[in-house]
Amino acid sequence: MSATSNMRVFLPVLLAALLGMEQVHSLMCFSCTDQKNNINCLWPVSCQEKDHYCITLSAAAGFGNVNLGYTLNKGCSPICPSENVNLNLGVASVNSYCCQSSFCNFSAAGLGLRASIPLLGLGLLLSLLALLQLSP
C-alpha cells in the first residue's frame, strides 16, 4: 500500500473522528490564595464544569507610603460574587473582578487609592478645630 493510499484512508477517518467528537469547553483561570503580589498568582488551573467565571479578589490597607497589608486571591467560580466591586474607604480598599474567558484574570484587581499622609493630617486638624469650636 502506497503513502498516497494510506492518506486517502487516513484523512476521511480523521475527518469523521473530528466531526463526531463532542466539543469540550473547559474554562482555564489563574489561581492563588492569600498572595502578596500578582507574580505568585499566575498558576493556570482547569476549572470544573460548574465554574463559569474566573475571579480576582484583592484587599489593601495603608496610607501614604505605609502599606498595612495586601492580599490577592484568584480562581474559578460558579458565580460572580458581585459585578466588579471597587470599594475604596480612603485607607483601605476591596476589589473584585469577574470575567468569563480563559485566562482573563491575568491582572491583579486594582489596588485602589490610599489616602496621603497630608490629607489624613488635614482631616485630623479640621476635626480637632471643629471639636474646639463646639465645646462650651
Curated annotation (Swiss-Prot):
Residues 109-136 form a propeptide. Residues 27-118 form the UPAR/Ly6 domain. One of its GO terms (biological process) is adrenal gland development. GO terms for molecular function: acetylcholine receptor binding; acetylcholine receptor inhibitor activity. Pfam families: Toxin_TOLIP (PF00087). Disulfide bonds join C29-C54, C32-C41, C47-C76, C80-C98, C99-C104. InterPro entries: Ly-6/neurotoxin-like_GPI-ap, LY6_UPA_recep-like, Snake_toxin-like_sf, Toxin/TOLIP. It is found in: Cell membrane. Interacts with CHRNA4. Interacts with CD3Z/CD247. It comes from Mus musculus. This is Lymphocyte antigen 6E.
